């Protein structure tokens, strides 16, 4: 995901409000149909949009994302002296994992590709969200999930049976996209060279990332038959949401996978590692389906001692 450059704005409205020592009213719109309204140890849904510390800011940003808002404005109170500085810290591209982590707790349909934070030194904060999925993609994916559901789900299946069936369906119809990482590395080099030449010249358009497959999204495995870990994970998260099962995504520095709350316990599901890239002696890819990382608890996951599964336990506190 990409975090846009922060812009500083001076607004007459905020100046007038500050002069009279009042806080402008906050407009809270209706949440969209994909809002989960779930709170976790790390971050919580809030109805109070006046922040007094960093946790309050995280809760506001999380609520904005979970609600599916395209734009939201709130204000730093005079008592919160470090508010703008904390906003700068959270928004710094060097700290991009702060905002992307919030996206792991929400519906994939409400997740973002750009999260712009505009602020002025008087404390007006405006968030602008560009969502990862378009309405057209959401309709297409939802219809595809419904179609697969009719094909593989039987009336006597339990929730775990349905998860198992989708786990196998996605893996059997998908291959890990080894090309994606090479294309992304080439794009990042191209983008770096662009800014070295053009700097902050806004008349020049930066190149866009155009991978062969949309492997980082649910459209990859469901339609193009290729995925990287985020594509597998989004597809499974959408299924878990459809089942009404509490779930979120877990991210390490190099990987992402699902966890679901089953029988009063958080269980890990890693489709990527259950769909390994295997090749025969001639170098031909061999389709492989495993259940090694299907609904396993945290102690079992940790027994494998896989570096990709080294996540921040101060964030994903529920996983014990």
List where the protein language model places each region.
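Hydrophobic/aromatic-rich core segments of domains that either
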Residues: 230-301
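Extracytoplasmic/secreted proteins, especially bacterial periplasmic and envelope-associated proteins
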Residues: 11, 56, 97, 140, ...
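Secondary-structure boundary elements
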Residues: 133-220
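Intrinsically disordered, low-complexity N-terminal segments that are enriched in acidic
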Residues: 2-128
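Leloir-type glycosyltransferase catalytic cores
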Residues: 289-320
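Secondary-structure transition/turn motif
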Residues: 128-135, 262, 272
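Flexible, surface-exposed loop/gating regions in the mature catalytic domains
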Residues: 176-189, 207-249, 256-257, 273
């Amino acid at each position: 995901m990409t975090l846009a450059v922060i812009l500083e704005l001076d607004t007459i409205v905020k100046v007038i409000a500050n002069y009279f020592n009042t806080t402008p009213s906050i407009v809270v719109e209706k949440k969209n149909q994909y809002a989960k309204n779930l709170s976790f140890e790390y971050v919580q849904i809030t109805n109070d949009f006046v922040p007094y510390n960093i946790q309050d800011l995280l809760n506001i940003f999380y609520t904005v994302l979970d609600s599916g808002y395209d734009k939201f404005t709130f204000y730093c109170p005079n008592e919160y002296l470090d508010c703008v500085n904390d906003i700068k810290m959270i928004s710094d591209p060097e700290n991009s994992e702060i905002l992307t982590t919030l996206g792991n707790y929400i519906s994939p349909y409400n997740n973002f590709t750009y999260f712009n934070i505009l602020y002025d030194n008087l404390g007006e904060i405006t968030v602008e969200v560009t969502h990862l999925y378009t309405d057209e993609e959401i309709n297409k994916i939802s219809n595809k999930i419904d179609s697969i559901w009719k094909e593989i789900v039987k009336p006597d299946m339990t929730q775990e049976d349905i998860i198992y069936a989708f786990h196998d369906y996605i893996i059997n119809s998908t291959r890990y996209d080894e090309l994606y990482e090479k294309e992304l590395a080439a794009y990042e080099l191209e983008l770096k060279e662009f800014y070295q030449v053009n700097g902050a010249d806004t008349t020049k358009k930066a190149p866009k990332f155009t991978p062969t497959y949309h492997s980082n999204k649910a459209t990859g495995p469901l339609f193009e038959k290729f995925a990287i870990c985020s594509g597998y994970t989004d597809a499974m998260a959408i299924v878990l949401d459809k089942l009404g099962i509490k779930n979120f995504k877990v991210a390490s520095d190099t990987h992402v996978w699902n966890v679901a709350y089953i029988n009063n316990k958080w269980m890990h599901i890693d489709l990527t590692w259950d769909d390994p890239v295997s090749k025969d002696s001639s170098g031909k890819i061999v389709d492989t389906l495993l259940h090694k990382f299907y609904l396993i608890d945290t102690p079992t996951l940790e027994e494998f001692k896989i570096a990709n599964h080294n996540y921040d336990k101060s964030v994903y506190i529920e996983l014990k």
